[in-house]
Amino acid sequence: MIAFVSGPVAALAPDSAVVEVGGIGIAVQCTPNTLSGLRMGREAKLATSLVVREDSLTLYGFVDDDERQVFELLQTASGVGPRLAQAMLAVHTPDALRRAVSTGDEKALVAVPGIGKKGAQKLLLELKDRLGEPLGTGGPAIGRAVTTGWREQLHAALIGLGYATREADEAVAAVAPQAEAAGGTPQVGQLLKAALQTLNRTR
């Protein structure tokens, strides 16, 4: 198992980063919030989880070991693959997911694209004894502040979660006032949650 990768960031894409390790570029799939903390040419260390399929090897990257552990635990529930687990962590912090599961907060899970009411109920039952209690007081969405490119990151995140370009455009426009109100440091995680709420209302 590849537990982490460490090295300069060689490339950034809407849903992934390339970290140079020993002269080799390692592609790592990341949430928008993880990507928002990376900068081209700067050193980065990401906890990782390797997902092995018949026709592919995919490395997922996280800000810390706790996020990685939750990513792996989520996949122990039936119907949850790496893409859905990553989508859940794009919308909620690990602690917010623990809190949602421990309190039976169905709405928090339905806020994740790809999870309906019945799916949320099933996940609450299956994950209740697996995620454990919240470790701290983290909010319902990841709050890493970013100073530039929030529109591009948010748009790419929505496309990655399966929304059409038109829907992503409308959602980005809808949350623009919230981003502008935050001044120079809009938080992509909070904007993503607001955008998803907007999309859920219009569907």
Swiss-Prot record:
Start and end residues of each stretch annotated as Domain I: 1-63
Q: Which stretches does the entry tag as region Domain II?
A: 64-141
Q: Where in the cell is it found?
A: Cytoplasm
Question: Quick one: signal sequence residues?
Answer: none
Q: SUPFAM superfamilies from the xrefs?
A: DNA helicase RuvA subunit, C-terminal domain, Nucleic acid-binding proteins, RuvA domain 2-like
Q: Which GO terms describe its biological process?
A: DNA recombination; DNA repair
Give the Gene Ontology MF terms in alphabetical order: ATP binding; four-way junction DNA binding; four-way junction helicase activity
Q: Which GO terms describe its cellular component?
A: cytoplasm; Holliday junction helicase complex; Holliday junction resolvase complex
Q: Which portions of the sequence form the region Flexible linker?
A: 141-145
Recorded domain comment: Has three domains with a flexible linker between the domains II and III and assumes an 'L' shape. Domain III is highly mobile and contacts RuvB.
Q: What does this protein do?
A: The RuvA-RuvB-RuvC complex processes Holliday junction (HJ) DNA during genetic recombination and DNA repair, while the RuvA-RuvB complex plays an important role in the rescue of blocked DNA replication forks via replication fork reversal (RFR). RuvA specifically binds to HJ cruciform DNA, conferring on it an open structure. The RuvB hexamer acts as an ATP-dependent pump, pulling dsDNA into and through the RuvAB complex. HJ branch migration allows RuvC to scan DNA until it finds its consensus sequence, where it cleaves and resolves the cruciform DNA.
Family in the record: Belongs to the RuvA family.
What is the protein name for this chain?
Holliday junction branch migration complex subunit RuvA
- State the organism named in the record: Streptomyces avermitilis (strain ATCC 31267 / DSM 46492 / JCM 5070 / NBRC 14893 / NCIMB 12804 / NRRL 8165 / MA-4680)
Supply the source organism's classification: Bacteria, Bacillati, Actinomycetota, Actinomycetes, Kitasatosporales
